[in-house]
Amino acid sequence: MTIRTRFAPSPTGLLHVGNARAALFNFLFARHHGGEFLLRIEDTDKERSTQKAVDVIFDGLAWMGIEADAEPVFQSARQDRHTEVALELLAKGQAYKCFCTPEELTAMREKAMAEKRPPRYDGTWRDRDPSEAPEGAPYVVRLKAPREGETVIKDLVQGEVRVANAEMDDLILLRSDGTPTYLHAVVCDDHDMEITHVMRGDDHLTNTFRQAMIYRAMGWDLPHFAHLPLIHGPDGAKLSKRHGAQSVVDFREEGYLPEALCNYLLRLGWGHGDAEVLSREEQIKLFDLDGVGRSPSRMDYVKLAHLNGIWMRQADDERLTNDVMERLQGREGVVTDDKTRARILAMMPGLKERAKTLVELADNAAFAGFTLPLTFTPKAEKLLGEDGRRVLEGVGKELAALKDFTPEAIDATLRSYAEKHEIKLGSVAQPLRAAMTGSTTSPGIDLTLSALGQDEVLARIAAVLASGSANA
């Protein structure tokens, strides 16, 4: 048997982190077992489904490196098949036409609530002859659900779960306008796509009992179900905007690498030893459902940022530089030309050691494209007082005399200057850093000066010396 999983989002908004994790788990499970991972867009809600949301799903999955093994299936294109199955159930006596009016259904609900019973359809038309209905009256098609016994699901994560059939009502398969309901369409699609394992959030668990009834009414084998615990905020409440990023788009814009997000989401609810950083190959090799817990997971943004920093330090410098240049586009006071790009690329080994997100990395690298005169932070301005400017004037002359403006030559020059004037190396490096960046942080000063280039370094020193004060 070929293992076949699917990710089936509704295109009604952004790709939420919970759905992204479900997609990742389905993808890894299929790859681990040498199976297939499929994508289905459940777009039957025409009022809420948009092409923009479809594109967001496709872009998000591609960014995460999650690739389907076949062209995506659009649920709306399969409506004829959904209708065909419902009519087959009708012909087999496993479904029936219900002619109840909206008013009758409302009265039914109100009566149940008044009697403190769950508001369920009471089966008024379950055994009645359709000929009793007024000619041309609208109807829905309902499943004739079993009323005795239990429906049992052997869930691969939650264990054995069961519900008394008496607690379930006869769910609608086709609405009065002939369109299929979500629960019915999903069963038809999963069966026809030969899905062997359905992995989704445990908020779908109650739906599974109803869907199992459709499978059994059609005489179809049920897939294996695995309902994954939800992701909560750090405080244990439902994840919301007040906690921070929620969607893949949010995390991407906030500067997280896809490798880091996938790595984090995998370990959020799945455990395997103490390994913190796992490559995609390792994820595929190790992932299986026996490591998935039942309890909700809590989003830890601090841990994610830490993990992102690890992945950034391992990332290719060209790739990081390209991302930084995109983020700096249009920023006031920053030139984003080839010269700036070359400077950032040269400094990237030092820049990426300090940053935990690409946003932070871009902020730290922006000085490479600053236009003169620079604006200085209060701490930087303090370093550029009388003593600092004296250092700049003196060391500037020695830097101007260098024929090879390499990190090694610069380091030797700064050390020699400090030794000659009997001051600490930091007393030389700190004013230089302030003059170059407008702040007090940068990669190593030798790497920073070399990357900026001799002409730019001397120009920035001159700009400080020419002003009455740093921010004049």
Curated annotation (Swiss-Prot):
UniProt motif 'HIGH' region: location: 9-19
Residues engaged in binding ATP: K241
Single biological process term from Gene Ontology: glutamyl-tRNA aminoacylation
GO molecular function, one term: glutamate-tRNA ligase activity
Record's keyword terms, sorted: Aminoacyl-tRNA synthetase, ATP-binding, Cytoplasm, Ligase, Nucleotide-binding, Protein biosynthesis
Short sequence motif named 'KMSKS' region, residue ranges: 238-242
Magnesium recorded as keyword: no
Subcellular location: Cytoplasm
Enzyme class: ligase
Enzyme Commission (EC) number: 6.1.1.17
Similarity remark: Belongs to the class-I aminoacyl-tRNA synthetase family. Glutamate--tRNA ligase type 1 subfamily.
The protein's assembly and partners: Monomer.
Name listed for the protein in its UniProt record: Glutamate--tRNA ligase 1
Species for this entry: Gluconobacter oxydans (strain 621H) (Gluconobacter suboxydans)
Classification of source organism: Bacteria, Pseudomonadati, Pseudomonadota, Alphaproteobacteria, Acetobacterales
Gene: gltX1
